[in-house]
Amino acid sequence: MTTIYWDVETYSECNLEGHGAHVYAIHKSTDGLLFCYAIDDGEIQTWMPGDPVPVVFANPADHKFVSDNWDFERQILEHVLVPRYGFAPIPLENHDCAQRLALANAYPAKVSRRCEALDLPFREDTDARAAMRRLSSPPPSKKPSKRKKVKTEDPDTLAAAFAAAREHDFKLLRERCQNDVATTRAAYNSPLLKPLLPEERHTLVLDAAINTRGICANVPFLQAVIALADEEYAAINARLSEMTEGEITAVTQVPRIKKAVNARGHKMTTLGKRSVSAVLAHQPDDFTQEILTLRKKGAYTVGGTAKRLLAHASPEDSRIRGALRYYGGATGRWSSPGPQLHGLNRNDSELSIDLVDAVLAGDHTTLAQHGDPLKVAANLCRAGLCAAPGHVLICADFGAVESRVTAWLAGEEWKLKGFREYDITHDERLHVYRQVAAQMLNINIDNVRQPERQTGKSGELACNFGGSIGAWRKITGDTDTPDAVLMGYIKKWRKAHPKIVRYWQLVGRAARAAIRTGKLQFVAPAPAPQVMAAYDGRALTLTLPSGRAITYPNARVVPSDKFEDGDPEVEFFDNARGQWTAVRAWGGKLVENIVQGTARDLLRDAIIRAEARGWKVVFHCHDELVVEAPEGSLSESEVLALLLESPPWAAGLPLGGKVHSGPLYLEALESPPKDKIAEQSTATNKPSATDTDWNAALEREFPRANGGPKPVDPVEDEAPQTTPVDEAAIRQRMAEQGLLGRARRLHKRPRHGRARASSPRQLRRLKRRRHRHQHCRRRRLHGRHRHPNARRGAGTVAVIRSADTSAGTRSQSTFTSTRTARPISGLISTSGFRHAGARNPTRNTSSTKMAIGPRAHPIPSFRIGYPS
């Protein structure tokens, strides 16, 4: 089969980037200017309107047609060249795309950067690019000039000059088109680009068919959203102008808003969501409060989202086509660069679908009852996609697929067992976040309430791929909790997932070994799912259990740039943020790529099965599959069963999910959701009337236990508590969360953390250092030695709190060391700090105890210099 490389140049009044290839191609003004083509390694030829149809395009069945971006060329062929110039339709199976092949090998999509990455010569002719812009679109409209026009040339001379300039532009355009064909041919045949696997080639063809099919846009709803947004923006802008006396006239004037806020003593460098919320949380003056509140309301871009969807919808049938890009990410996941359908907000607020009617009616009052109207509209924007008349959308998506895949790859059996139990019973008590919270906090799952569940959720989302404090804050938006508290939660998550933590190390080690030795490396032996690392001298590949490989071009092993004694990292080149630059990855990041790639392959197999059954897949988003079917022809259970059908390569992987259907892509919620956690909590776990504010009570009883204020001198704090506190309930909750039996250091001493030796000499030094600190600790526990780094006069102390429950009185005894005259109150830590070695009057010969209330709880010993 011969290969035809071709590139087409067109003219249109329609904007290609703003409307997409399909709307551009069907526009009445769109026409072909010329196209160039080459047969195999032959000479590049040019076709222009009026020329006969080339033979290879008249009989396309026996040829393969390769273009750089086949979305554009296929649309121009179907809607321009075939109906107007007599070209023969080319079967979809005979098309191929050089850009998709490059993306599948983790190389850039843009031609110039791709040639740079593939070491191919490429010359960007700025004159030819300018000529292409002049010929491909009408000249920009100019404002009428106020200057007096002076006639310098006669019309005939101007016409001749225009014709000469146009002829010169066509010459430059032809040269540019020929250069594009040569570049496409060289890139497509580059030895650095490995061909697609047969199943991936089949997926590429299915992707083109799904993009051609498209999904319907809900035009009335989108138009109503635009009108609603315009009214809200107008009201916000009017108020801003009134407040600032015309200084700020629009909520989009970010520099002016920052200037106005900073003039009142603030130091805002950005107006991002977190920055604005942080300033508002500190209760600024009324002017700052109102102006930032208006900015927060006006920051929602729901109006722009609706306009973008309308612009990409076909004027013929309102369907959005070409919205999905195959290999939008290096892991193989799809993206939606044009209309950005993957960026549509979920209905996280669980708003009723009845509010869609309120948007259609422009009912601001009803919308305002559920929050800011712009925010409500943003949460409902998935209603902008709908089914065709007489059809429904059946949407099925995997549940916690990344957590499931990670546990399956690493062999975290307790988690896999929990997923299987949840899939069988559908008991919300067994939800993954509750199970993780129970494992992290070492409590019974029946005692997991909403705060503990949120901790489990945050840990699962932030720590699954090795994330630490930064990842936790980024995912949760928590900027107030101390680092030590968050690190305590992170350590608990890692302690509950020892095999996942081990898997990060195995993957990083296998990748480094493959690069260093050039030999195939298995991450884990059978029967674990097979993940292999290989290196061909230039690119590292990680082969997934499905058989597909993720590529890391120009990979090499480099020292860690984050930790002095950390493991080496893998450096490779990536098209990050549109730039071909070097980036780094370690074991956790590589595991994230493997997990996302495996989840993507699960979705790919589901798409193939659905299309094989004759179902019409119209859209898919990350882990979700959307099928359009005539009403009553297909059930939700059938689609969900197909999605959860495990492929042969994923044996033992528990899959779960949910499904909903209706005329809209938005999930229907007829009534406010029930608080499942509150319903399933047992009566014995409900807070008592005297202990409704857990955080406040904890801070009152145990200073700094929940990030509270600095502890005060107990001698000066003799005033009785005016707020009744259920101390027994407090102790019970602290025991459930694993907070008892941990004391803070009461003086400074060095921490060595995860110190690692890079040489035998350094190893001996570390051993001596650790032995020295362990020896100091043993002597300190028995009261015979004071740590040499302790601040003079800051001795240790233990505080005994006791309560006489029969008499209803409380007493507190304070014991100080011989080196200080000022007692220091004892502290309880929520973050798992190690014991400080304080002398404790309740200590006996068998164990060290610290009394809290009427009971004494043992304090476990920890090795100095190691994380608890």
Residue spans of the language-model regions?
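Conserved "right-hand" nucleotidyltransferase catalytic core of DNA-directed polymerases
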Residues: M1-E9, C14, A106, A117, ...
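Conserved DEDDh/DEDDy metal-dependent 3′-5′ exonuclease domain
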Residues: T3-I4, N15-H19, V23-S190, C395, ...
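Compositionally biased, intrinsically disordered low-complexity segments enriched in Pro/Arg/Gln/His
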Residues: Q737, L746-R751, P760-Q774, R778-R784, ...
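Short, low-complexity segments with poor structural confidence in diverse proteins
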Residues: I800-T809, T814-I824, I828-T830, R834, ...
